[in-house]
């Protein structure tokens, strides 16, 4: 194996000599020195790993004589793409990951420190490795760079257009749960949008009309209604317990009469939703919450992205819970997505379950963990 190894090194060295001459540099190495520089100063880590697999040089430095002066630098080949998801590390390497995947899987990524001492060579102090450090694992993510780029640009345009404070976009593979792109943008102090908090997992927000599908599925599953059952909506105003439920067209004064469950979904009718759940659960609201539990929207889940102390679990009240007040209007308002707080990732998981034929899959970002390239 010696001939191809030496030839490989010769090619690398000749290439560097030509590059140096093109820059007007003519470096000469003293053959009388005990140590000889065999490669350029800035070979990458992949090449160094390859060299250390060669016979003789795969031993400790005190046996092989191979001394490599390492310089650590963090590089982002895709710039700020998926910056928050990938995460960051502290300037102090000992502290490890600071956010994102870097923080979540810090114990795997950081590896095990080695042992080295410093020796003066040709008037210059150099690090000599006594016990090589053990490399950390590599993470293969589900993120598709092209999809991520498109998602970031699209979300940024929409936020600028609507002058919103923040926004989240998530693209998920239906069958597998792989997140192909995820963007969390917040408005910064300068007015521009940039990656901020992991809102996809932690932003507690009322889901609004997206929750109407949940209410309808529970009522259908419990046999409370059928798709053809109808409720009177009139001009879009319905009073319950001295509070008004309004449909979006109520200002027009148009009398729509009765709407079926199907029509109520098509028109996103708050009145149909509220009357539907009151019919089935007014006297036993806990049964409606049990239906939410069957779907899994109150289940506490862990994610690939650390939430800085925020659990990111849905805040959906339960009747008779002394810590959370349950009023007479909680149930009907909950039916159309109010009086609940659900992170976006939960609603994504729910709708993905519908697209996946009823099978709900937990979204994930870390696809594979690789040790030593395997």
Go through the PLM ranges and name each one.
Residues 4-135:
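Small/polar-residue-rich segments within soluble enzyme cores
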Residues 36, 124-167:
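Conserved, well-ordered alpha-helix/loop/beta-strand core segments that scaffold catalytic motifs
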């Amino acid at each position: 194996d010696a001939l191809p190894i030496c030839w490989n090194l010769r090619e690398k060295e000749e290439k560097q000599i030509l590059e140096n001459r093109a820059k007007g540099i003519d470096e000469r190495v003293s053959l009388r020195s005990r140590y000889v520089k065999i490669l350029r100063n800035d070979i990458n880590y992949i090449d160094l790993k390859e060299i250390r697999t060669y016979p003789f040089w795969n031993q400790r430095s005190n046996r092989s004589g191979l001394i490599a002066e390492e310089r650590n630098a963090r590089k982002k080949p895709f710039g700020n793409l998926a910056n928050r998801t990938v995460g960051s590390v502290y300037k102090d390497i000992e502290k490890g990951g600071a956010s994102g995947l870097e923080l979540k899987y810090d114990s795997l990524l950081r590896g095990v420190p080695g042992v080295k001492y410093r020796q003066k060579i040709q008037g210059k102090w150099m690090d000599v490795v006594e016990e090589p450090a053990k490399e950390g694992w590599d993470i293969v993510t589900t993120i598709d760079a092209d999809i991520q780029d498109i998602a970031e640009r699209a979300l940024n345009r929409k936020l600028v257009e609507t002058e919103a404070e923040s926004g989240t976009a998530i693209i998920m593979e239906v069958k597998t749960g792989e997140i192909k792109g995820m963007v969390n943008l917040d408005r910064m102090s300068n007015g521009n949008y940039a990656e901020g908090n992991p809102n996809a997992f932690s932003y507690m927000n009322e889901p609004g009309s997206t929750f109407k599908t949940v209410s309808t599925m529970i009522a259908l599953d419990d046999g409370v209604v059928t798709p053809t059952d109808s409720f009177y909506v009139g001009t879009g105003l319905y009073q319950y317990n001295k509070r008004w439920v309004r449909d979006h067209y109520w200002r027009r004064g148009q009398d729509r009469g009765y709407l079926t469950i199907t029509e109520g979904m098509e028109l996103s009718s708050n009145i149909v939703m509220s009357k539907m759940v009151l019919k089935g659960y007014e006297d036993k609201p806990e049964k409606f919450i049990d239906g939410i539990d069957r779907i899994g929207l109150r289940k506490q889940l862990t994610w690939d992205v650390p939430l800085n102390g925020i659990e990111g679990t849905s805040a959906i009240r339960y009747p008779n819970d002394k810590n959370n007040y349950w009023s007479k209007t909680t149930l009907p308002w909950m039916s159309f997505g109010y009086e609940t707080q659900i992170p976006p990732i939960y609603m994504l998981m729910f709708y993905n379950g519908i697209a996946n034929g009823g099978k709900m899959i937990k979204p994930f970002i870390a696809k594979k963990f690789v040790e030593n390239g395997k």
